[in-house]
């Protein structure tokens, strides 16, 4: 079995694991990853309890399949639990998911932002619920099928990237505190997706060859604009499309239909490549520019969470999107002299493309996650200096 908690070269002491026979909650979606994670926990001798959160409702016409919240996936989670001989429970958290994930998602798009709903779900729904549920049932440990690692160091439990850099999900878990990490197990952290898939097939797990969705679980079509429009039709604000010289070159039905960096589907033709470089929800304007206008020298970071040993200014690497290669930079802490409120600014060593408000800026040093927060604004050279 892969190591559940791994030593980090030079700084970490050997990872402590729950003793054999300890009770462990495993979040089960019915997918390959959580199924293999559950099987590995069973192999390690733990008393494993499967838990599925019912988060979203889908049409009953069979049009939605292989999503982490679809009815058949909940059924698959139970089938896997039966296959492994472990108890399985489903808890209804649809109202919580709507409040903390879906509604903020809609609000963010109306505000011209590109949100990170998977971060909100992990922070405010899944782990927020799993820890109390575990405590209520006398369970000390919680496990998930995320591709990430927890390392026990002198200062406490730390979050590290998963070994599979293509599947690494530490970006979506950056907000976890040390006391939470100390109770988390990531059985897949040292494995690649191909290894996990092969293991699921070899074990004969139900759903072992199930496909993997690249879309949000609550918008399986990937069509975000209609989803937002259906839920906020009376708040959509038409506005102008403006080129880099300030000329109005078209109109649109709402900023919710655009994201920074978008090139296709803008609705106008300028005779040259044009990209969405800014969204102004207050005026309703969509600003276009050349590809070079997409690059930012820095980012203002809000709602930040940092590890307790972070010292500023912090020299590290910053990921501004889940699939973005981390860019070197310096994170500075600023304090408002009037209110005392803290804010943070990331200054990149070289300009970074498509820094989108609403996405997360997650900070790394090597494989270790130091923290991060929501991108409030992309900063041009003069603003980041």
UniProtKB/Swiss-Prot annotation:
Assigned GO CC terms: cytoplasm
Residues with site note (Interaction with tRNA):
146, 359
The GO terms this record gives for MF are: ATP binding; tRNA binding; tRNA-uridine 2-sulfurtransferase activity
Name the SUPFAM superfamilies for this protein.
Adenine nucleotide alpha hydrolases-like
- Which InterPro entries does the annotation name? MnmA-like (IPR004506), MnmA-like_C (IPR046885), MnmA-like_central (IPR046884), MnmA-like_central_sf (IPR023382), Rossmann-like_a/b/a_fold (IPR014729)
NCBIfam families noted in UniProt? PRK00143.1, trmU
- Catalytic positions are 121 (nucleophile), 217 (cysteine persulfide intermediate)
Interaction with tRNA: annotated segments = 167-169
Protein name, as recorded = tRNA-specific 2-thiouridylase MnmA
Keyword Disulfide bond listed = yes
Reaction(s) the record says it catalyses: S-sulfanyl-L-cysteinyl-[protein] + uridine(34) in tRNA + AH2 + ATP = 2-thiouridine(34) in tRNA + L-cysteinyl-[protein] + A + AMP + diphosphate + H(+)
What is this protein's function per UniProt?
Catalyzes the 2-thiolation of uridine at the wobble position (U34) of tRNA, leading to the formation of s(2)U34.
Question: What protein family does this chain belong to?
Answer: Belongs to the MnmA/TRMU family.
Instruction: Tell me the GO BP annotations in alphabetical order.
Output: tRNA wobble position uridine thiolation
The entry's ATP-binding residues are 27-34, 53, 145
Main enzyme class: transferase
Q: List the disulfide bonds.
A: 121-217
Whose protein is this, by species? Sorangium cellulosum (strain So ce56) (Polyangium cellulosum (strain So ce56))
KW Ligase (keyword) present:
no
Instruction: Identify the gene encoding this protein.
Output: mnmA
Q: Looking at the record's lineage, which domain of life comes first?
A: Bacteria
The EC number of this protein is: 2.8.1.13
Give any Pfam family that matches: tRNA_Me_trans
Q: Which UniProt keywords apply?
A: ATP-binding, Cytoplasm, Disulfide bond, Nucleotide-binding, RNA-binding, Transferase, tRNA processing, tRNA-binding
């Amino acid at each position: 079995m892969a190591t559940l908690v791994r030593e980090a070269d030079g700084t970490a002491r050997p990872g402590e694991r729950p003793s054999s026979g300890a009770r462990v909650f495993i979040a089960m979606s019915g997918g390959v990853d959580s199924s293999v994670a559950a099987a590995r926990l069973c192999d390690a001798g733990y008393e494993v309890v499967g838990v599925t959160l019912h988060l979203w409702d889908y049409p009953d016409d069979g049009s939605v399949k292989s999503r982490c919240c679809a009815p058949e996936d909940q059924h698959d989670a139970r089938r896997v639990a039966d296959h492994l001989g472990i108890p399985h429970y489903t808890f209804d958290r649809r109202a919580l998911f709507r409040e903390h994930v879906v509604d903020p998602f809609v609000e963010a798009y109306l505000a011209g932002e590109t949100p990170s709903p998977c971060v909100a779900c992990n922070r405010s729904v899944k782990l927020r619920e799993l820890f109390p549920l575990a405590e209520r049932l006398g369970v000390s440990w919680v496990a998930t099928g995320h591709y990430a690692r927890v390392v026990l160091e002198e200062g406490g439990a730390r979050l590290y990237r998963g070994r599979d850099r293509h599947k690494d999900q530490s970006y979506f878990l950056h907000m976890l505190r040390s006391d939470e990490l100390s109770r988390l197990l990531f059985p897949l952290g040292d494995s690649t997706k191909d290894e996990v898939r092969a293991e699921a097939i070899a074990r004969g797990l139900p759903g072992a060859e199930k496909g993997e969705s690249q879309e949000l679980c609550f918008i399986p079509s990937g069509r975000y604009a209609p989803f937002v429009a259906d839920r906020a039709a009376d708040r959509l604000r038409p506005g102008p499309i403006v080129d880099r010289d300030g000329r109005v070159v078209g109109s649109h039905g709402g900023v919710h239909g655009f994201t920074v960096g978008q090139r296709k589907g803008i609705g106008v033709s300028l005779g040259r490549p044009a990209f969405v470089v800014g969204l102004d929800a207050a005026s309703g304007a969509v600003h276009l520019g050349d590809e070079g206008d997409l690059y930012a020298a820095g980012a203002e970071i809000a709602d930040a969470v940092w590890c307790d040993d972070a010292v500023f200014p912090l020299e590290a690497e910053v990921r501004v999107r889940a699939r973005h290669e981390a860019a070197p930079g310096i994170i500075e802490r600023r304090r408002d002299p009037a209110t005392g409120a803290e804010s943070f600014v990331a200054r990149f060593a070289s300009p970074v493309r498509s820094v989108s408000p609403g996405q997360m800026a997650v900070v790394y040093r090597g494989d270790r996650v130091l923290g991060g927060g929501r991108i409030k604004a992309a900063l041009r050279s003069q603003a980041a200096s």
